[in-house]
Amino acid sequence: MKELDVITLLQEIRHLAQESNAVILAHYYQDSEIQDIADFIGDSLELSRKAATTTADVIVFCGVYFMAEVAKIINPAKKVLLPDLNAGCSLADSCDAESFKKFRELHKDCVSITYINSLAEVKAYSDIICTSSSAEKIIRQIPEEKQILFAPDKFLGAFLEKKTNRKMILWPGTCIVHESFSERELIDMMVRHDKAYVLAHPECPGHLLKYAHFIGSTTQLLKFSSDNPNSEFIVLTEEGIIHQMKKVSSGSTFYIVKTSDSGGCVSCSKCPHMRLNTLEKLYLCLKNGYPEITLDPEISSMAKRSLDAMLKMS
C-alpha cells in the first residue's frame, strides 16, 4: 500500500467513525497501524471494561471473534462490528459448546471458570469468565472446598494451579502461537543477550515459563517493561505488544523468539487470526456497517451472567 493510500484510509476511517458515533477498540496483538488509529488499546479485561462503559452507538472491535462477541453480550442494543468474521481463535475453537456441556455434566458440583478466549455458547454454560490478568484473583475467591473446572487453556490453567496452590480439572486447549515458541531459540537468545529479562505470557507451556523473569498478561508485561530499569527484554507473546512496549520504553530493546515448525504460525510470533484485520477491512466495515456480530438472545443473556461475575470479581 502506498503511503498516500494509508493516509487517505486513516482519514476516511476517522471521518466514518465520527459520522456513525463509533468507537474503535483494538487488542495489543493487532497490526501497529490499527493500534495507532484505535480509540482504545488494551488486553481482554481492559477491552471488556471499555465495551461496558462506552457511550458510542457502534463498537468496532479490532481483535478476534470471541472478543467482539463479548462486546455484543455486554451491549446487546449496540451494533458491534468485526472487520473480518473469519478472525477466530485456536483456544476458542478447541472448546465447542456440546463437548463443554458434557464436560460440565460430568462435574456438576464444580465451579466452572472459563478463560475469556471462548465462544459465547461456552460462556453461557460457565459460572465465571476470567482473563489472564484477573484469573488468579478470581480463583482465590473460590472456597477451598470447591473443585474448579478450568477451560480452555491447559497451560494457563497449569500456571494458575502453581500460583494458587489449587488443583483444577483442566480442559486441554492451547494457543497456536504461545505453544509454538521454540525452547532452543529461547535459550540461544538468552545466551546472545545475557543481560535481557525474559517476559512471558502464561499461555506459554511450562517448559518455557521456567526461564521467565516475569510472567503476566499483555498489560502486565507492558507495565513491567516500562517500570523495570533493565533495557533489554526477550518477549514470549504475540509480537503486536512490542509496538506499545517501544512507545512506553523508547530506550529499550525487545527481542522476539521464533516459533518451532510444528505450530500454526511458523517461524514468527504473529497470530494469523488477529492479523486478518486490516486497515482496508476496518474502513469497509465502517463504510458498510458490517460484518456485524449477532447472537442468540438466550445465549447472550446466559453468557452475560458469567461475564458480569468476572467484572465484579476482578
Swiss-Prot record:
UniProt KW keywords: 4Fe-4S, Cytoplasm, Iron, Iron-sulfur, Metal-binding, Pyridine nucleotide biosynthesis, Transferase
Superkingdom of the organism of origin: Bacteria
UniProt record, GO biological process: 'de novo' NAD biosynthetic process from L-aspartate
Catalytic activity of the protein: iminosuccinate + dihydroxyacetone phosphate = quinolinate + phosphate + 2 H2O + H(+)
GO MF annotation terms: 4 iron, 4 sulfur cluster binding; metal ion binding; quinolinate synthetase A activity
N-terminal signal peptide: none
Keyword Transcription attached: no
InterPro entries linked to this entry: NadA (IPR003473), NadA_sf (IPR036094), Quinolinate_synth_type2 (IPR023066)
EC id: 2.5.1.72
Location in or out of the cell: Cytoplasm
Main location: cytoplasm
Pathway membership: Cofactor biosynthesis; NAD(+) biosynthesis; quinolinate from iminoaspartate: step 1/1
Binding site for [4Fe-4S] cluster: C89, C175, C271
EC class of the enzyme, as a word: transferase
One Pfam family hit: NadA
Cofactor binding note: Binds 1 [4Fe-4S] cluster per subunit.
Cofactors required: [4Fe-4S] cluster
A GO term from the CC aspect: cytosol
Keyword 4Fe-4S: yes
Function of the protein: Catalyzes the condensation of iminoaspartate with dihydroxyacetone phosphate to form quinolinate.
Annotated family: Belongs to the quinolinate synthase family. Type 2 subfamily.
The name this protein goes by in its record: Quinolinate synthase
Species name: Ehrlichia chaffeensis (strain ATCC CRL-10679 / Arkansas)
Name of the gene encoding the protein in the UniProt record: nadA
